[in-house]
Amino acid sequence: MKVAGVFLLLSLALLCFFSGAFSQGGQDKRGWITRSEGRFPGKGVLRHRLFQINCGEFRDPKVFCTRESDPLCGSDGQTYGNKCAFCKALEKSSGKINLKHRGKC
């Protein structure tokens, strides 16, 4: 049973690694914003965090943001109330803001 669990975890790790989940950051054509943080301190050691937000639904200027609270911290040190507010600020900044982490700054 332990061997099967180890094999499953190793398979999932390899799948994530080779599927492109560890991108360098930026915005792709589907509207997904990726922000990766971390360093590669040595061979075989990987410390990496990946944040993704889908801003595709907020690109329309006719869409207004609600007041729901789900704070996001931007790379500019600003706390945005929710995903919509962050995406609107990202659009206004021409992509210069990145997602630092979820929660208040």
From Swiss-Prot:
Keywords: Disulfide bond, Protease inhibitor, Pyrrolidone carboxylic acid, Secreted, Serine protease inhibitor, Signal. The record marks 67-68 as: Reactive bond. The modification Pyrrolidone carboxylic acid is found at residue 24. PANTHER family: SERINE PROTEASE INHIBITOR KAZAL-TYPE 6, SERINE PROTEASE INHIBITOR KAZAL-TYPE 7 SPINK7. Pfam families: Kazal_1 (PF00050). GO terms for molecular function: serine-type endopeptidase inhibitor activity. This is Serine protease inhibitor Kazal-type 6. SUPFAM superfamilies: Kazal-type serine protease inhibitors (SSF100895). It comes from Mus musculus (Mouse).
